[in-house]
Amino acid sequence: MINYPESLANRIIKGSTLDKDEANELLLLEGTDANALFLAASRVRDHFLGTGVDLCSIINAKSGRCPENCAFCAQSAHHATNAPVYPLVDEEQITACAREAAGAGSHCFGIVTSGSAISRGEELDRICRALRRIRRETAIEPSCSLGVIDYETALALREAGAVTYHHNLETARSFFPNVCTTHDYEEDVETVRVAKRAGLKVCCGGIFGLGETPEQRVEMALTLRELDVDSIPLNFLNPIEGTPLAGADRITPLECLKTIAVYRLILPDRKIAVCGGRERNLRDLQSWMFFAGASGTMIGNYLTTTGRPPEQDWQMLADLGLTVRQCNG
């Protein structure tokens, strides 16, 4: 079995694709076979993307009171949490955070707002003004994560300077009703398609540890491949008190790493960033995410939880002998 991941990597490098049954089998590997999987994923990443690492950062630009009932989310109005609640911040604060992110080495800066969708009018106008300033004043690539959007909104964001639109599927279609019942999975899929039609790159992934099966993790990866997304953020549940998943069992570091590796083999030439929950779930194996095929990570704080200082991530990358891709505007 130890040669099996290597043979799959060779096949993928030659242009073949990983199918569902192969992916499910890989998630069952243990011991030295799992190490062989990580090595295969790392080889595939190096072949298609090189060894440079992409860093990204976000601002929680509008927080709390979300009408959706996503079971993992601290910002849902359906859950009693201590998440901060505030309206959309001003363009100066957004731009200042973008400058700070660029100074910390981030390649991409995401403007994230709570809620089902951003409102047309002043909210959208303010975000567009901030996007224009970010493009003028920094070399960082701006991204937006504003919920469900229509084509006109997507076009306005792109024309203002947004490079990427972020919108997660969160989990597999077959498991989604266990996570959220206030909107349909197809709305999220259509948002991805709308952003692509408007000429935006799409960053789309999900969160693991919600109670989904390994097979459902593969299911989401295959959906992302079908949607032809450009980059995939992989998050791991950090349970928040007051949410329905506050007492959820954590997945093991090795489960996290195998998931990262299988996503790399399913999506060989796409950017894969490990984001929220990495500190809690990977623990002492955080640096292994790159050995398992990740090509990037989020630095700084997350939406409602604290990340570690960027200097620690820079030191981790230096210790691994990895370089950070530079912003080029």
Curated annotation (Swiss-Prot):
GO biological process: biotin biosynthetic process
Range of residues in the leader sequence: none
Cofactor detail note: Binds 1 [4Fe-4S] cluster. The cluster is coordinated with 3 cysteines and an exchangeable S-adenosyl-L-methionine.
Keywords: 2Fe-2S, 4Fe-4S, Biotin biosynthesis, Iron, Iron-sulfur, Metal-binding, S-adenosyl-L-methionine, Transferase
Enzyme class, UniProt record, top EC level: transferase
Residues involved in [4Fe-4S] cluster binding: 66, 70, 73
The protein's Enzyme Commission number: 2.8.1.6
PANTHER family, per the entry: BIOTIN SYNTHASE, BIOTIN SYNTHASE, MITOCHONDRIAL
Task performed by this protein: Catalyzes the conversion of dethiobiotin (DTB) to biotin by the insertion of a sulfur atom into dethiobiotin via a radical-based mechanism.
Name by which UniProt lists this protein: Biotin synthase
Source species: Geobacter sulfurreducens (strain ATCC 51573 / DSM 12127 / PCA)
